[in-house]
Amino acid sequence: MKFLLVLIILYNILNSAHSAPTITAVSNGKFGVPTYITITGTGFTGTPVVTIGGQTCDPVIVANTASLQCQFSAQLAPGNSNFDVIVKVGGVPSTGGNGLFKYTPPTLSTIFPNNGRIGMILVDGPSNISGYKLNVNDSINSAMLSVTADSVSPTIYFLVPNTIAGGLLNLELIQPFGFSTIVTSKSVFSPTITSITPLAFDLTPTNVTVTGKYFGTTASVTMGSHIYTGLTVQDDGTNCHVIFTTRSVYESSNTITAKASTGVDMIYLDNQGNQQPITFTYNPPTITSTKQVNDSVEISTTNTGTDFTQISLTMGTSSPTNLVITGTNEKIVITLPHALPEGEIQFNLKAGISNVVTSTLLVTPVINSVTQAPHNGGSITISGIFLNNAHVSIVVDQNTTDIVCAPDSNGESIICPVEAGSGTINLVVTNYKNFASDPTIKTEATTSTTYTIPDTPTPTDTATPSPTPTETATPSPTPKPTSTPEETEAPSSATTLISPLSLIVIFISFVLLI
């Protein structure tokens, strides 16, 4: 009987030795995160003991002889390796579990901006995320960033410096514990302008500051068609700033655009966070005085710069295109054509894209010379400028008489009829506003001079018919008629005087007839 019991015990021992558990599959774990691992195989009986990579996987839940689960939270290194799994049943270790366990590598599910930071959500990441690093590269500048203190798995944050330009970024998430680097490219945020000051300025060089985020290390700004390049970005830790100095000329448009160091367009957000275009204005110019100097006009101004292409001159309905304009930021000199379509001219000072500032000037005729008048009447020639539509009158004994003259088209001379006489005659030449001679219109610009009539005729002083005007001035009071050639004709040189001898002959002949 005892011999039979010994045989049974030996049989069980031998049978157990031949029934060691086997492992055919093992599910992945999450690094540093308690995870139930499923082990598939055979011979999972009794109370198995499971180890993974030498670390206990516990507690063990046996579903059946072919499957069990155990909870595993150890952090095996390096995390990207394969580890052995052993299941012991009755002290007998399993077979087939070599290298079947590995961690599921962490992946990124979301990348998003967060108040100046790049936020990332890890899938299957470790509970301890403090060792993560992020290498950010904008194709020109790069920075190695650490996880911020408020990061909590699975969400991690990296604070991005303003020296990184917004736009498409190359992101390298460097993982600890031996996991591979995660590389991706994403446009997380744009270079953003929060303010530009000032946006209204004079036409003198003015420092303008552009403030925002993610400009990179250099930036460029375009005003109208002019580009300011290579501007250094100043980073105060919260915002970045770019300063450029405007030109003293009017730009072609009132828009401002800017690019980060990578060439990415900056966007401008208003106080509500809405994207808006950027526009600026010039402070309007001022005209302090206008003065005529011979054939030029001196306009004293402020805030006009040196870009005289924006200055125009209106004369009546026309705007001459061949004006000679010179000057400085405080004084503009315009040389006028000598013939004017109207007496009053208007200047338009345009501050680029700003409103036009205007000023008017009634041009005074300029007399350079007057020819001497014939003693017996005839014509005189007045030479000067701005005479093409001037009104001419003579003043004798405080009596004023308008005369109709013939101007040339160049505005440089007038031929006027004059009566016979002698002495010095006052001559008045006037430009009226709009060249109107209506006496009720008080706006006028007058210049005076004199001409002389000799007391006796000169050897060549013969009666000269008054010229027929080739051009009629605007209506004026009916001029006092001048003498006709017949009325002023001198005695004919053919008239014969009767001598005393002839008178005696005539007397004797008369006596003889009686």
Swiss-Prot record:
**Domain IPT/TIG residues, every copy:** 21-104, 191-283
| Ranges for region 2 X 8 AA repeats, Pro-rich | 462-479
Location of region: Globular? 20-453
UniProt topology in membrane: Lipid-anchor; GPI-anchor
What InterPro entries does the database record attribute to this sequence?
Dictyostelium_Tiger, Ig-like_fold, Ig_E-set
Q: Where is the signal peptide?
A: 1-19
* UniProt entry keywords in alphabetical sequence: Cell adhesion, Cell membrane, Glycoprotein, GPI-anchor, Lipoprotein, Membrane, Phosphoprotein, Repeat, Signal
Cite the Gene3D superfamilies for this sequence: Immunoglobulins
Q: Which residues form a coiled coil?
A: none
* Stretch list, region Disordered: 446-494
Q: Fill in the PTM field for this protein.
A: Phosphorylated on serine and N-glycosylated with two types of oligosaccharide chains. The GPI-like-anchor contains a phosphoceramide group, rather than a phosphatidyl group.
For the keyword Transferase, the answer is no
Repeat (sequence) positions are 462-469, 472-479
Q: Which GO terms describe its biological process?
A: aggregation involved in sorocarp development; calcium-independent cell-cell adhesion via plasma membrane cell-adhesion molecules; cell-cell adhesion; cell-cell adhesion via plasma-membrane adhesion molecules; cortical actin cytoskeleton organization; homophilic cell adhesion via plasma membrane adhesion molecules; response to curcumin; response to UV-C
The protein's recorded glycosylation sites are: 128, 137, 207, 294, 399
**Chief location category:** membrane
Lipid modification (GPI-like-anchor amidated serine), residues: 492
Regions of compositional bias (Low complexity) in chain numbering: 446-475, 483-494
Further remarks about this protein from its record: The expression of this stringently regulated protein during cell development is mediated through cell-surface cAMP receptors.
Q: Provide the domain comment.
A: The C-terminal region contains clusters of proline regularly alternating with a hydroxyamino acid. This domain might act as a spacer to elevate sites active in cell contact into the extracellular space.
Function summary: This cell-surface glycoprotein mediates cell-cell binding via homophilic interaction.
Its name, as the record gives it, is Contact site A protein
Record the organism. Answer: Dictyostelium discoideum (Social amoeba)
The UniProt gene name for this protein comes to csaA
